[in-house]
Amino acid sequence: MPIIEQVGAREILDSRGNPTVEVEVALIDGTFARAAVPSGASTGEHEAVELRDGGDRYGGKGVKKAVEAVLDEIGPAVIGLNADDQRLVDQALVDLDGTPDKSRLGGNSILGVSLAVAKAASESAELPLFRYIGGPNAHILPVPMMNILNGGAHADTGVDIQEFMVAPIGAPSFSEALRWGAEVYHALKAVLKKAGLSTGLGDEGGFAPDVASTTAALDLISQAIEAAGFKPGVDVALALDAAANEFHADGSYTFEGTPRTAAQMTEFYAGLLGSYPLVSIEDPLYENDWDGWAALTAEIGDRVQIVGDDVFVTNPERLEEGIDRGVANALLVKVNQIGTLTETLDAVALAHHSGYRTMISHRSGETEDTIIADLAVAVGSGQIKTGAPARSERVAKYNQLLRIEEALGDAARYAGDLAFPRFVADPK
């Protein structure tokens, strides 16, 4: 039995230079694994709560308290448990914390232990992590949703939309999809230079030019797709993360300098669908605007994937309410929003059983940990969002997917355009 023997933790830095938690787990059979916890910039109010130190150190963002929680309380509680009983381990973590949002011990400390236990168990079983979590049929490689132009909370510009992504839906394999996306990324740099725009990078490795509008940004990316030798909507499609929480206040959306209602935002998105090959729109409205979300889904949900991030926060209870209300048709999956691997898998299972698509996602504050790459293949999500093909904390996930594709050999299947059944390349 892979019994947990030791649990350690330390404070490390994430990709934005902020502290985060790294956990190490050793099993009685000598197996060892570590996991690092990501952190978001634009966060939903219903997410699991991170335990931060406050005070002057690291601007209040230190995680010494979270590390102490692992060493003094969480570790001793799981030592002696069977690492390959993930549900039992995670339930012990949830019960130990005793709060609905993991605010006592911290979602960051709890998640670090949960993920490190899973990694150690997979090592003990001598199975790749994607196979350990997903079982013998895990073989679908996801479409990389590459955030090649950053705005919103991920960049210091006037662009309200947070992420402009390219999705290589026409590629024959993941490795080719990665190449296509990288070539579009480099073509975009040339397009921006020619237009006299900045080629500085945002938090997730995408370019962060100060463009005039959403449509101007989409036009630049469309030019880059064509300049790289691909056809927009056939080879490479577009996707957005509006992160509407960031421009919503007092019941109104201040978007591109104009106050708008939820209905007016819906009309705006519908107009984009008629002009650009968009396969996915994430967080188009404020997280608590259930009625607006339901109306938007009814209006355009048959033509585009509508992804719930802040509205669902990878929480099965929030997702179930959204399903009942007819909100969105896809779930964004972020392990640190809910705080354990088991709860993450439960949210994915609920989404799939309810006809919702899933997209596995990184956070803007990332580390070199690659578990989300394995998770995407394990659950067969068909989509992964982990930034631009730049910056090592982003590329690490893509490189892990290359390794998984190679390991699967002829059994590997790339999701491609089948990941977006609502999308029609030429609606006319």
From Swiss-Prot:
It is an enzyme of class 4 (lyase). InterPro entries: Enolase, Enolase-like_C_sf, Enolase-like_N, Enolase_C, Enolase_CS, Enolase_N. Its cofactor is Mg(2+). It catalyses: (2R)-2-phosphoglycerate = phosphoenolpyruvate + H2O. GO terms for biological process: glycolytic process. Pathway: Carbohydrate degradation; glycolysis; pyruvate from D-glyceraldehyde 3-phosphate: step 4/5. It comes from the Bacteria. Keywords: Cytoplasm, Glycolysis, Lyase, Magnesium, Metal-binding, Secreted. The keyword Transmembrane does not apply. SMART domains: Enolase_C, Enolase_N. It is found in: Cytoplasm; Secreted; Cell surface. The keyword Lyase applies. Its EC number is 4.2.1.11. SUPFAM superfamilies: Enolase C-terminal domain-like, Enolase N-terminal domain-like. GO terms for molecular function: magnesium ion binding; phosphopyruvate hydratase activity. PROSITE patterns: ENOLASE (PS00164). Catalyzes the reversible conversion of 2-phosphoglycerate (2-PG) into phosphoenolpyruvate (PEP). It is essential for the degradation of carbohydrates via glycolysis. PANTHER family: ENOLASE (PTHR11902:SF1). This is Enolase. The lineage of its organism: Bacteria, Bacillati, Actinomycetota, Actinomycetes, Mycobacteriales. The gene is eno.
